[in-house]
UniProtKB/Swiss-Prot annotation:
Full protein name: ATP synthase gamma chain
Alphabetical list of SUPFAM superfamilies matching this protein: ATP synthase (F1-ATPase), gamma subunit
Membrane association type: Peripheral membrane protein
One Gene Ontology term, aspect cellular component: proton-transporting ATP synthase complex
Organism this protein belongs to: Tolumonas auensis (strain DSM 9187 / NBRC 110442 / TA 4)
Family, per entry: Belongs to the ATPase gamma chain family.
């Protein structure tokens, strides 16, 4: 029964793992609901900011902020939002693939690429990849604040102001639903114009008091910060959803494996009992 004993030990080990993955699934489900609430609270503000800024980009301002002006692209920057922890399926890998595809398109045109990395997984990946990181932040936990991000955002905005980058992108996982999280690459700077065709035909604009320069300087920075924060909370909700699904799959697979091992154990035990009975019968016959 040495083989059967080994199988019993393996079954016990898989059951312990199943308990862990089951607990992680429940924890991820709870955290996902909280992350969804946080995302739902911030999304209307981010969407409205994007709409207002898109309207401004369509307007005919005498004062043209540098964030509104297209310029020759020699260097691009990416703010890449990843997770701090693993065990969330292919969430990070799919995100990095999308970022690399976009980066490759620019590099083929001879454009330099710089990054600001949010989350330890992005830091580890692009350190091996050899990318130039201007800023890095991690360890924000399950309730990140916009204050945690201001440093990295400020570095990229200063690089843009100084002409060190000519275009800025935000890369994150957009939360669609529990089963679907979409890697997204959004252009942040220069500001993309609103794609509202009806709005474009009306040719209306805002009235600025006392003047557009001071207002735009503050508003455009808040816009970038709000979009990055929204990307972080969307990515956090995506992380918990992906982890919940991954842990459920692991728990289910552990159950299937336990069933298969139990069958093997029963067969081994049956074979052992049959052999013992055969030996007893053979011994009795010899007597």
């Amino acid at each position: 029964m040495a083989g059967a004993k080994e199988i019993r030990n393996k079954i016990a080990s898989v059951k312990n793992t199943q308990k862990i993955t089951g607990a992680m699934e429940m924890v991820a489900a709870s955290k996902m609901r909280k992350a969804q609430e946080r995302m739902a609270y911030s999304r209307p503000y981010a969407v409205t900011m994007r709409k207002v800024i898109g309207h401004i980009a369509l307007g005919n301002l005498e004062y043209k902020h540098s964030y509104l002006i297209e310029r020759e692209v020699k260097r691009v920057g990416y703010i890449i939002v990843s997770t701090d922890r693993g065990l969330c399926g292919g969430l990070n890998i799919n995100l990095f693939k999308s970022a690399l595809v976009s980066m490759k398109e620019w590099k083929e045109q001879g454009v330099e690429v710089s990054t600001a990395l949010i989350g330890s997984k992005a830091a580890n990946f692009f350190e091996r990849f050899g990318g130039k990181a201007l800023a890095q932040v991690s360890g924000m936990g399950d309730a990140p604040s916009i204050g945690d991000l201001i440093g990295s955002v400020k570095v990229m905005l200063q690089a843009y102001d100084n002409g060190e980058i000519d275009r800025l992108y935000l890369v994150y996982n957009k939360f669609v639903n529990t089963m679907v999280q979409t890697p997204t690459v959004d252009q942040m700077l220069p500001l993309p114009k609103a794609d509202d065709q009806a709005l474009a035909k009306r040719h209306w604009d805002y009235l600025y008091e006392p003047d557009p320069k001071h207002l735009l300087n503050e508003l455009l920075i808040r816009y970038v910060e709000s979009q990055v924060y929204q990307g972080v909370v969307e990515n956090l909700a995506s992380e918990q959803a992906a982890r919940m699904v991954a842990m459920k799959a692991a728990t289910d697979n552990a159950g299937d494996l336990i069933g298969d091992l139990q069958l093997v154990y029963n067969k081994a035990r049956q074979a052992s009992i049959t052999q013992e009975l055969t030996e007893i019968v053979s011994g009795a016959s010899a007597v």
